[in-house]
């Protein structure tokens, strides 16, 4: 075999190896990625996969129910268009309260309740996830359009 052919096979082998390695790395990232979506997006998807993901929004006013015998807490996360019931077992952050920006991480159960493994409250009371802010802006915009009639 000529040196030229050997070099060609070497280059092709390196390109194939790099391609396979890149595909494996991207696949690993995709499998470990935690998605951040709004309650409206959760409600729009009828069959949420059994994947671990995050929901961002506000703790709905009047929705927090604490179990007096345990650390079990139930509340709803809303973006004002839709809300998702959340079930959490554990200690909530000190800044957790109704009307506060929150991000919950976990899985949606077959009965539509989000089983949270982690609850993160935002330090700044003016904080709102970007997706939730966009949803609020859409609602305000649609209300303005309806009011123009």
UniProtKB/Swiss-Prot annotation:
- Where are the bilayer-spanning segments? 8-28
Role this protein plays: Heme chaperone required for the biogenesis of c-type cytochromes. Transiently binds heme delivered by CcmC and transfers the heme to apo-cytochromes in a process facilitated by CcmF and CcmH.
Q: Has the keyword Lyase been applied to this entry? A: no
Name assigned to this protein:
Cytochrome c-type biogenesis protein CcmE
Q: What GO CC terms are in its UniProt record?
A: plasma membrane
Q: Which residues lie on this side of the membrane: Periplasmic?
A: 29-149
Q: What is its main location?
A: membrane
Q: Where in the cell is it found?
A: Cell inner membrane
Keywords (A to Z) from UniProt: Cell inner membrane, Cell membrane, Cytochrome c-type biogenesis, Heme, Iron, Membrane, Metal-binding, Signal-anchor, Transmembrane, Transmembrane helix
According to the UniProt entry, the coiled-coil residues are none
- Family per UniProt? Belongs to the CcmE/CycJ family.
Native source organism of the sequence: Halorhodospira halophila (strain DSM 244 / SL1) (Ectothiorhodospira halophila (strain DSM 244 / SL1))
- Annotated GO biological process: cytochrome complex assembly
Tell me the Pfam families matching this sequence: CcmE
Q: Could you tell me which residue ranges are on the Cytoplasmic side of the membrane? A: 1-7
- Binding positions (heme): 123, 127
Which branch of life, at top level? Bacteria
- Gene Ontology molecular-function annotations: heme binding; metal ion binding
> What InterPro entries does this protein map onto?
CcmE, CcmE-like_sf, NA-bd_OB-fold
Q: How does it sit in the membrane?
A: Single-pass type II membrane protein
